[in-house]
């Protein structure tokens, strides 16, 4: 099978044949407008989360002329997610937790305002409320399986901040959407924020989120806990950003992790990232399955897809997790690649 599994613990059997709901939680971070902590180009960073979910839901981006694409010509991972949605007929519903620009599709709004300034220790002041909104929303979503992704430019920096704030060894271990991972800049930004917010070992998980998290995190934690409490499996579809969500879940409700109903689903590109260590982070949190989908992009006809194998983009918009589900449920990964290749010039025509 084209899945790399660590601590699988029978999780793949739990998602086989299940009828899923895919949701992507989007947010923006004010810090990204002035400090280059994101791999997304500053000219499009305000529009990227909305353009991503528009592509997944509608089949094309509306907020931008084309779907997001990076400097190496690598298309947004939303192209992978769209392929799985289309090929496996997966229902999808998207959630705004503070994107700068709102998507031009139907969506659920949980918070209108973006995440604030991480370096000031002022990410938000309502993380507990956002958690409860995510939790209550999850209780009202009817699906046999939740696959939840994110599109948050700069989100690996907030992931680092939350992991450090909760006491994990995470410096130099979070991934990046770009080939050159600016570890030192990320560490400087979050250390400043943690210090200014007065975070210490007595601080609560919500204190840490309010200081250096992003608004996606408490929302996804609430969604995941609400599903797992009802004995429904959850794929946290993402890389090191979802490891931070996992750490938040552990702080709020450790018992749900012990049920073996929550797993991280990511891409081979994150798991094999030499400048990150998703496996090492998750092992500190608990015995949680980490599942990575393989795509065989080295055989792609499009150079931008081949660049994923060289460290570009890697993950996002739930790509790895929704692909894990799709592959377990009999979709050949070559079909994902072929779908993107067939649609590429339609999506990216000027």
UniProtKB/Swiss-Prot annotation:
Q: Which InterPro entries match?
A: Nict_dMeBzImd_PRibTrfase, Nict_dMeBzImd_PRibTrfase_arc, Nict_dMeBzImd_PRibTrfase_sf
Q: What Pfam family is a match, any one? A: DBI_PRT
Q: Which SUPFAM superfamilies match?
A: Nicotinate mononucleotide:5,6-dimethylbenzimidazole phosphoribosyltransferase (CobT) (SSF52733)
A single Gene Ontology molecular function, please?
nicotinate-nucleotide-dimethylbenzimidazole phosphoribosyltransferase activity
Member of which family? Answer: Belongs to the UPF0284 family.
Q: Which PANTHER family match?
A: PTHR38811, UPF0284 PROTEIN SLL1500 (PTHR38811:SF1)
* Name under which the protein is recorded: UPF0284 protein MJ1598
């Amino acid at each position: 099978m084209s899945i790399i599994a660590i601590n699988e613990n029978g999780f793949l059997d739990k998602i086989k044949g299940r009828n899923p709901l895919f949701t992507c939680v989007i947010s923006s971070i004010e810090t990204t407008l002035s400090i280059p902590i994101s791999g997304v180009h500053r000219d499009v960073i305000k529009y990227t989360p909305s353009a991503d979910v528009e592509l997944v839901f509608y089949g094309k981006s509306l907020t931008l002329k084309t779907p997001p694409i990076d400097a190496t010509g690598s298309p947004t991972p939303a192209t992978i997610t769209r392929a799985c949605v289309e090929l496996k007929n997966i229902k999808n519903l998207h959630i705004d937790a503070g994107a700068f620009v709102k998507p031009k599709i139907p969506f659920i709004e949980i918070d209108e305002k973006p995440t604030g300034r991480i370096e000031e220790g002022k990410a938000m002041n309502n993380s507990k409320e956002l958690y409860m909104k995510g939790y209550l929303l999850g209780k009202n979503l009817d699906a046999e399986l939740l696959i939840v992704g994110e599109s948050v430019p700069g989100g690996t920096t907030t992931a680092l901040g939350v992991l450090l704030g909760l006491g994990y060894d995470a410096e130099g271990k979070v991934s990046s959407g770009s080939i050159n991972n600016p570890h030192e800049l990320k560490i400087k930004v979050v250390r400043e924020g943690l210090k200014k917010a007065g975070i210490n070992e007595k601080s609560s998980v919500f204190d840490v989120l309010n200081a250096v998290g992003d608004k996606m995190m408490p929302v996804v934690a609430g969604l995941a806990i609400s599903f797992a409490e009802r004995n429904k499996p959850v794929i946290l579809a993402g890389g090191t950003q979802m490891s931070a969500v996992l750490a938040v879940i552990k702080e709020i409700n450790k018992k749900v992790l012990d049920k073996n109903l929550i797993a991280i689903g990511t891409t081979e590109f994150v798991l094999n990232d030499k400048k990150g260590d998703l496996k090492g982070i998750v092992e500190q949190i608990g015995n949680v399955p980490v599942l990575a989908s393989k795509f065989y992009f080295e055989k792609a006809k499009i150079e931008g897809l081949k660049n994923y194998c060289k460290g570009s983009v890697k993950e996002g918009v739930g790509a790895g997790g929704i692909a894990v589900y799709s592959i377990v449920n009999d979709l050949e990964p070559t079909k994902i690649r072929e779908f993107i290749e067939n649609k590429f010039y339609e999506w990216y025509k000027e």
